[in-house]
Amino acid sequence: CIDGKLQPNATYELNGNIYTTDDNERIISCEARPIRSPENPRENEAQLQAGGADRRPNDQGGHIVGRDMNGDSGIGNLVAMDSKINQSDYKRMENDIKSTLDEGKDVTTKTEITYNDVSQRPDKIIVTVIADEKGTIYKFDNNLDNSLKNETPENEKEIIQDRLNETNGTISSIKEEYDKENNLVETTVYITYKNEDGTNYRTSVIIEN
């Protein structure tokens, strides 16, 4: 960062985690080795700046690597995340990682972030977590527009669509679990919806392969 801004086409290191930006100064990837750590203090100003002019009212500054897993607090580890993603789906993934770390296993993650055109706000975040030679891929829809429907298992699309119709919800994330031979073992599709009083709820469809 120079004067609080990320630089274009740069690779930089924060707390041992490696980040890459594109020619629009946006973080597009992060390779990390999360560890349990004291929670780094928040940088509220940096969190409020994430997404710039493309930030939406429901967005928060979401840490790519959690502050309690040796993730930096500043703008180099932040993207604009919809609050439903940041506080639920992404947090669920972080809790999965922390549980794995608590089992004494080494964990590595690779995060890939995609954007629409020149927007500073991500459309999709994909995190590949490797632990015990097994991979888990988490896909997050930051727009909550059901664009992940195309990535659900073909044989269960009807069941997933029925659940979407019942709840009037959207697919907020997908979790794919693989074995050591990289065979897909289980897919969990998470659906976010509101009830009549406006409270957010989540439900899921689990598909075994």
Label each residue range with its predicted role.
Residues 5-196, 200-207:
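Domain-level detector of nuclease and nuclease-like folds
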